[in-house]
């Protein structure tokens, strides 16, 4: 998906693995498998104008991955599951079944 170098905090990655059962390695794997559903600006542009949000399917569930880009580097900030984005996955899967 990207030719950028992808970086993240080791401590944050460990915290996400312990608290949410998902890691930045899962994000990279999903990106390699074309699991990126969307790439949007952060919804709060006043406060986080520099951030973007990847919507990624990880193990069948949609997650938001907040990140920033600095030159050729993509720095992953956090991951959280998204019920709203999950509905998009379900709708997409329903459309595929119908076709």
Residue ranges and their predicted role:
Residues 1-99:
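Ribonuclease/tRNase effector modules and their secretory precursors
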